[in-house]
Design a protein with these regions (language model features):
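Bacterial N-terminal signal peptides that target proteins for export
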Residues: 1-6
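C-terminal motif of bacterial Sec signal peptides marking the signal peptidase cleavage site
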Residues: 14-17
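Bacterial signal peptide processing site
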Residues: 19-22
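Hydrophobic helical h-region of N-terminal Sec-dependent signal peptides
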Residues: 7-12
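Serine-esterase "nucleophile elbow" of acetyl-processing enzymes
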Residues: 26-88, 94, 98-106
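Alpha-helical cap/lid subdomain in secreted, periplasmic
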Residues: 71, 78, 94-223
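Intrinsically disordered, low-complexity, compositionally biased regions/tails
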Residues: 24-25, 210
Length: 223
């Protein structure tokens, strides 16, 4: 990201952490334990597993990235069902605490999107790495293909932390031979017109781009 983009995200994060700005309109969070509909839908499951960026904080439930991904799958003729297992505010540690609720669904693919809140809070990068590795390991042991969503953070904790954080995602992906989305918010982060008033969470239009970022990596796994 260029300097202006980084500065914009940094200011947005500071504003959010201080409680400033107008709050985004609320949306219902996804359940901590994903549910399977009782209509005997036998399509293979793709679970979107993450924090508020996955849950779709601030947008209509039909406009978040999991919902848009379902629409793209349907339009492309792929018979999969997307289950949104995003919970706002979660760190990688909290994701690890509930990874078993995803495994019991026996998903074909899990898109793992954690780390943004770790980086925002300046949590130890090594702890994030270990949590993410454990999540991926457990999901693969359950038979799922795993896609890791790469994250980037502004440099407010210094270059060493920022660079180390960015390296977590490709390194874990390489270790476990998992697929990697290089940057989940590529083309969205730092663009005010594609983000809500907090400067962090995408708008419905922003999620259109997020879905394309996901699709580039996910679609080859479905062929």
């Amino acid at each position: 990201m260029n300097r202006d983009v980084v500065l914009f995200i940094f200011l947005a994060l500071v504003c959010l952490s201080c409680g400033g700005g107008t709050k985004p309109k609320k949306s219902e969070p996804a359940p901590a334990v994903p549910t399977v509909s009782p209509n005997r839908d036998l399509r293979p499951i793709i679970v979107t597993f993450g924090d508020s960026l996955t849950a779709g904080q601030g947008v209509d439930p039909n406009m978040n990235y999991p919902a848009k991904l379902q629409g793209k799958l349907d339009a492309a003729g792929y018979h999969y069902r997307v289950v949104n297992a995003g919970v706002s505010g979660e760190t990688s540690s909290q994701g690890l605490d509930r990874v078993q609720t995803v495994g019991v669904l026996h998903p074909a693919v899990v898109i793992v999107e954690f780390g943004a809140n770790d980086g925002l809070r300046g949590l130890p990068a090594e702890a994030t790495r270990q949590n993410l590795a454990a999540i991926v390991s457990r999901l693969q042991s359950a038979g799922a293909k795993v896609v890791i969503a790469g994250m980037q953070i502004p440099p407010n904790y210094g270059p060493q932390y920022t660079i180390g954080f960015r390296k977590i995602f490709p390194e874990v992906a390489k270790k476990f031979n998992a697929s990697l989305i290089p940057f989940f918010l590529d083309g969205v982060g730092g663009r005010p017109e594609l983000n809500q008033e907090d400067g962090i969470h995408p708008t419905a239009e922003g999620y259109d781009i997020v879905v394309e970022n996901v699709w580039k990596v996910l679609e080859p796994l479905l062929r």
